[in-house]
UniProtKB/Swiss-Prot annotation:
Major subcellular site: membrane
Function: F(1)F(0) ATP synthase produces ATP from ADP in the presence of a proton or sodium gradient. F-type ATPases consist of two structural domains, F(1) containing the extramembraneous catalytic core and F(0) containing the membrane proton channel, linked together by a central stalk and a peripheral stalk. During catalysis, ATP synthesis in the catalytic domain of F(1) is coupled via a rotary mechanism of the central stalk subunits to proton translocation. This protein is part of the stalk that links CF(0) to CF(1). It either transmits conformational changes from CF(0) to CF(1) or is implicated in proton conduction.
Quaternary assembly: F-type ATPases have 2 components, F(1) - the catalytic core - and F(0) - the membrane proton channel. F(1) has five subunits: alpha(3), beta(3), gamma(1), delta(1), epsilon(1). F(0) has three main subunits: a(1), b(2) and c(10-14). The alpha and beta chains form an alternating ring which encloses part of the gamma chain. F(1) is attached to F(0) by a central stalk formed by the gamma and epsilon chains, while a peripheral stalk is formed by the delta and b chains.
Family to which the UniProt record says this protein belongs: Belongs to the ATPase delta chain family.
GO molecular function terms noted in the UniProt entry: proton-transporting ATP synthase activity, rotational mechanism
Membrane-topology descriptor: Peripheral membrane protein
Keywords noted in UniProt: ATP synthesis, Cell inner membrane, Cell membrane, CF(1), Hydrogen ion transport, Ion transport, Membrane, Transport
Cysteines paired by S-S bonds: none
Pfam families in alphabetical order: OSCP
Protein name stated in the entry: ATP synthase subunit delta 2
Compartments (UniProt record): Cell inner membrane
Length: 213
């Protein structure tokens, strides 16, 4: 476990202090119109991060909070539960995080806890990272194979081909192993999936045989 997250987890289990004021959350309340939308929260957070020049710091803050909350189900359920006194949850939240993350990040977490929406934090982080990638002109390409092919000649050729196709972006490759695809490769570029797996070919073959019978 990350040392920062470990320290926070330890504190979360024992510390209580006073409630965070509603005034500190007011900026988010004005920006965010749709409480159920992680995209809106992420956009509000990113706009503020951009304004204060802390895009990467807030990105790190969000991941620290997420990892420290979710590492223990009891802690996560404590902050998620609407049956636990809101003032108590806020007091603990302030004691643990107020001096460890930026005030802007803390305000977002406080709003999520106050509105019983901490369960969408991961979705907010994903959307925030997407906005970061867009800002830095980064595109993430996920490559899935049935076995480890990261350093092979075939993989290097595939990466070169993709890089030539998307020459106007800074490409960040991620690699995943999934034995269920049997062979071949599955490439994900943003929301588009290019499935060249053996599994897909077998599925199509099976479907074709069924239609002809």
């Amino acid at each position: 476990m990350d040392p920062i997250a470990e320290n926070i987890l330890s504190d979360l289990k024992k510390e209580v202090l006073r409630e965070v004021t509603r005034e500190k959350a007011s900026r988010f309340s004005r920006i965010v119109k749709n409480e159920s939308s992680a995209k809106n929260y992420a956009k509000a957070m990113f706009d503020i991060a951009s304004d204060i020049g802390k895009i990467e710091v807030i990105k790190s803050d969000l991941n620290v909070v997420y990892s420290s909350l979710l590492v223990d189900n009891d802690i996560f359920n404590f902050f998620k539960s609407s049956f636990i006194d809101g003032h108590l949850r806020m007091r603990i939240l302030k004691k643990i995080y107020a001096d460890k993350i930026l005030e802007e990040t803390f305000n977002l977490i406080a709003i999520l806890v106050e509105r019983d929406m901490i369960n969408i934090l991961f979705a907010i982080i994903v959307e925030y990272e997407n906005l970061c990638n867009e800002y830095y002109n980064i595109i993430v390409v996920k490559i899935t194979t049935a076995s480890n092919m990261t350093d092979t000649e075939d993989m290097n050729k595939l990466k070169d081909h993709i890089t030539n196709m998307i020459s106007d972006k800074d490409i960040h490759f991620t690699f995943n192993i999934d034995e269920n695809i049997i062979g071949g490769v599955v490439i994900e570029v943003e929301d588009v999936v290019y499935d060249y797996s053996v599994r897909r070919l077998l599925t199509e073959l099976k479907s074709s045989i069924s239609e002809n019978n």
